[in-house]
């Protein structure tokens, strides 16, 4: 398939630049992967779509304030976007400035250039940066970092984004982009699901800035996915096995949860073992033709044209079903991308 097969026209006004006043106030487009049937509704309808015995799998990563501004010690403004925290004092980051810094370049970061760091090495398009102070990287980011809103939101971050560009169940710091399907859940709707007999499990995938990188090839088979770190614990494996045994569904909240679970499944297939814990980097690329091993239903936002995420949704729901759903979403003026509306999709099995 060609990348252009996943193109659709999206009016600029449908890109959500701010979240709804309430997390659960978004709309929900339901898609039946087998029949292709579409139903327009509200996100709160999800309470009727999940059943007792189902397992919802959330990504509990926490978005770090990964964007920093500053200058080279020799002069010249720059912007640093952390891609990954390497250890307590080092990060791997994208650096935007007029001239790329060379190893040994000293950087002064923060509004008042209060934190000094050294550009230690370059790894392809990324720069390894080490802070010189005894403070831990995460503490420095909390002090001077900005929330790394996606480029299409096209506005500076605001105080409200510290809360709203974060799930209510976040736990493990490390993401530089939110697992956005989870943004629709508040504590009240989670409590109602629990009361209904729905089970919860949590994986961790630290979403990288690579999630926003365009696919730069024509044939999707030539695309190489960026690497992200994922954790699927024994507790999650046990919950999945128990769910399948009782006839329940594994409902993935977000494409990052899908990629975590299916990475564990693919690793087990390669090893010739039962589904087992997974703690490793993953470059899994899911596109039409992929056979899902774990996930039965998916909660997800509306994704960018020609992105790997709309390819994943097409693999899950069927290509034609997905493109028709997106056409309806545009016609019915759903809000798109990170702060936008959501879909509830059941897997195409026939």
Curated annotation (Swiss-Prot):
UniProt subcellular location: Cytoplasm
Q: A Gene Ontology CC term for this entry?
A: cytoplasm
Tell whether Transferase is among the UniProt keywords: yes
Keywords attached to this Swiss-Prot or TrEMBL record, sorted alphabetically, are: Cytoplasm, Queuosine biosynthesis, S-adenosyl-L-methionine, Transferase
Mind listing the GO molecular function terms for this protein? S-adenosylmethionine:tRNA ribosyltransferase-isomerase activity
Q: Does the keyword Transferase apply?
A: yes
Q: Which GO terms describe its biological process?
A: queuosine biosynthetic process; tRNA wobble guanine modification
Primary location group: cytoplasm
Q: In which pathway does it act?
A: tRNA modification; tRNA-queuosine biosynthesis
EC class (word) = transferase
For this protein, the record's SUPFAM superfamilies field holds: QueA-like (SSF111337)
**Recorded catalytic activity of this chain's protein:** 7-aminomethyl-7-carbaguanosine(34) in tRNA + S-adenosyl-L-methionine = epoxyqueuosine(34) in tRNA + adenine + L-methionine + 2 H(+)
EC annotation? 2.4.99.17
Assembly description? Monomer.
The record's family statement is: Belongs to the QueA family.
- Protein's job: Transfers and isomerizes the ribose moiety from AdoMet to the 7-aminomethyl group of 7-deazaguanine (preQ1-tRNA) to give epoxyqueuosine (oQ-tRNA).
**Name of the protein this chain belongs to:** S-adenosylmethionine:tRNA ribosyltransferase-isomerase
């Amino acid at each position: 398939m060609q990348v252009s097969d996943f193109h659709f026209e999206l009016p600029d006004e449908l890109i959500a630049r701010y979240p709804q006043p309430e997390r659960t106030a978004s709309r929900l487009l339901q898609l039946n992967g087998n029949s292709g049937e579409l139903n327009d509704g509200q996100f709160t309808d999800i309470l009727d779509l999940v059943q007792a015995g189902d397992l919802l799998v959330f990504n509990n990563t926490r978005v770090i304030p990964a964007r920093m501004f500053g200058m080279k010690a020799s002069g010249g403004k720059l912007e640093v976007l952390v891609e990954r925290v390497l250890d307590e004092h080092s990060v791997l980051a994208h650096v935007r400035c007029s001239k790329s810094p060379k190893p040994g370049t000293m950087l002064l970061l923060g509004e008042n250039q209060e934190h000094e760091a050294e550009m230690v090495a370059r790894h392809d398009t990324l720069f390894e940066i080490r802070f010189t102070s005894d403070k831990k990287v995460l503490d420095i980011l909390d002090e001077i970092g900005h929330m790394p809103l996606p480029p299409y939101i096209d506005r500076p971050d605001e105080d409200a984004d510290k809360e709203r560009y974060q799930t209510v169940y976040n736990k493990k710091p490390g993401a530089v982009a939110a697992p956005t399907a989870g943004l629709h859940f508040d504590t009240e709707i989670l409590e109602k699901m629990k009361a209904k007999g729905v089970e919860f499990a949590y994986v961790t995938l630290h979403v990288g800035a690579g999630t926003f990188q365009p696919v730069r090839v024509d044939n999707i088979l030539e695309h190489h996915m960026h690497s992200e770190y994922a954790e699927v614990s024994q507790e999650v494996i046990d919950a999945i096995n128990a769910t399948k045994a009782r006839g329940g569904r594994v409902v993935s909240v977000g494409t990052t949860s899908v990629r975590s679970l299916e990475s564990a499944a693919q690793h087990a297939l390669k090893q010739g073992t039962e589904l087992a814990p997974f703690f490793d980097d993953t470059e899994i690329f899911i596109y039409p033709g992929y056979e899902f091993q774990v996930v039965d239903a998916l909660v997800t936002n509306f994704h960018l044209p020609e992105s790997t995420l709309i390819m994943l949704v097409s693999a899950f729901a069927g290509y034609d079903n997905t493109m028709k759903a997106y056409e309806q979403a545009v016609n019915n003026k759903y809000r798109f991308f990170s702060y936008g509306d959501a879909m509830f999709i059941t897997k195409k099995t026939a």
